[in-house]
């Protein structure tokens, strides 16, 4: 079990909100031939975590194996949504539409309920910003995300400040197929991505990078269910997205090409300087000073360094710079090539 100690690499939730707070206040050469949005990189296996990376809150403490359902079982699929860190702050972050998403299942044959969600192993701050360790030449990332499956649904957690609603009904056979997909998806999609990066807020604006977070997992799960023949109800489903807005991103390189022995020392210094203010703060004064540095870099000088697919990109930022949205993504349409047997 991973726990945060006084010297551990956990980040306080308030740090992760530093740039989100900026959003509430605000409301090289371009890469030629690049595919946009940049495809999320998948891996052949999930690597072991570094002991330096410590979680303040243990990941998936009540996790259990996914059971095999009887083919003739009738299972309700539930949409689960609640404010992030609701266990600590209640509905506070719900007022800013900062929501966490999950999927629930309810078996008719057994009467048992199950929850599956995808989230960070080491909390949001660690997945969004690195640590600048004196013993490492490059920024050090504690960034992994994974699926957590466990028996039971915390009705109070989801209903009190969020949503618990049935979106579809499937068979046990379909559940088993989705369970196999979840295992494969979990082993190949290993890291969390907070930001969705776009050219602008308008409809049809170019997307440069897609987020890979809890809501993305829910949407992928719904899509896979639709591929297996699931028919969803006609209800509105909204999700939180955190946007960065920039001109065409500029590819910079990976850790070796930038921070290695033959790397670009000037660029390496600029990247480390950028990430410096995002470190855990020690006092209110420290927090305010770092916030002003972030504002100066991102808003005044319009610079942002993004780490995506274990590679660094420069984002030439532009208005409105940062924005949190809570918008509808429709439930998928059933694929007619499959039947829900």
UniProtKB/Swiss-Prot annotation:
Reactions the enzyme catalyzes: S-hexadecanoyl-L-cysteinyl-[protein] + H2O = L-cysteinyl-[protein] + hexadecanoate + H(+)
Site feature Cleavage, where: 26-27
Entry annotated with the keyword Disulfide bond: yes
Post-translational modifications: N-glycosylated with both high mannose and complex type sugars. Glycosylation is important for proper folding and trafficking to the lysosomes.
Lumenal side: 31-341
Membrane-crossing residue ranges in chain numbering: 14-30
Residue positions of the active site: 100, 214
Topological domains annotated Cytoplasmic: 1-13
EC number: 2.3.1.-, 3.1.2.22
Keyword annotations: Disulfide bond, Glycoprotein, Hydrolase, Lysosome, Membrane, Neurodegeneration, Neuronal ceroid lipofuscinosis, Signal-anchor, Transferase, Transmembrane, Transmembrane helix
Disulfide bridge map: 53-142, 60-148
Region spans: Membrane-anchoring: 287-326
Function in brief: Exhibits palmitoyl protein thioesterase (S-depalmitoylation) activity in vitro and most likely plays a role in protein S-depalmitoylation.
PANTHER family tied to this protein: CEROID-LIPOFUSCINOSIS NEURONAL PROTEIN 5, CEROID-LIPOFUSCINOSIS, NEURONAL 5
Family: Belongs to the CLN5 family.
Protein name: Bis(monoacylglycero)phosphate synthase CLN5
Organism: Mus musculus
């Amino acid at each position: 079990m991973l726990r945060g100690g006084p010297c551990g690499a956990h980040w306080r939730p308030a740090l992760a909100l530093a740039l989100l707070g900026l959003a509430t206040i605000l409301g090289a050469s371009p890469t030629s031939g690049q595919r946009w949005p940049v495809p999320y990189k998948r891996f052949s296996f999930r690597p072991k975590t570094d002991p330096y990376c410590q979680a303040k809150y243990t990941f998936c403490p009540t996790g259990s194996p996914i059971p095999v359902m009887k083919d003739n079982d009738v299972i309700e699929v539930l949409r689960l949504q609640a404010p992030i860190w609701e266990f600590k702050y209640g509905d506070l972050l719900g007022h800013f539409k900062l929501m966490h998403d999950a999927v629930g299942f309810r078996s008719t044959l057994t009467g048992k309920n199950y929850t599956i969600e995808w989230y960070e192993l080491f909390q949001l701050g660690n997945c969004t910003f690195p640590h600048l360790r004196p013993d490492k030449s490059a920024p050090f990332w504690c960034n992994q995300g994974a699926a957590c499956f466990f028996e039971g649904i915390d009705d109070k957690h989801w209903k009190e400040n969020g949503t618990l609603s049935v979106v579809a009904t499937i068979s046990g056979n379909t559940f088993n197929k989705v369970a196999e997909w979840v295992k494969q998806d979990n082993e190949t999609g290993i890291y969390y991505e907070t930001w969705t990066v776009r050219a602008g807020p308008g409809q049809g604006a170019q997307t440069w990078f897609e987020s890979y977070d809890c809501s993305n997992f829910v949407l992928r799960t719904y899509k896979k269910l639709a591929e297996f023949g699931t028919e969803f109800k006609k209800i509105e489903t909204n999700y939180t997205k955190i946007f960065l807005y920039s001109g065409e991103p500029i590819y910079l390189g990976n850790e070796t090409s930038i921070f290695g022995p033959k790397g670009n020392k000037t660029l390496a210094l600029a990247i480390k300087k950028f990430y410096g203010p995002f470190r855990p703060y020690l006092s209110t004064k420290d927090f305010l000073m770092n916030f002003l540095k972030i504002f100066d870099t991102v808003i005044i000088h319009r610079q942002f360094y993004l780490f995506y697919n274990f590679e660094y990109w420069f984002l030439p930022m532009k208005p409105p710079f940062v924005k949190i949205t809570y918008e509808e993504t429709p439930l998928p349409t059933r694929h007619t090539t499959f039947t829900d047997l």
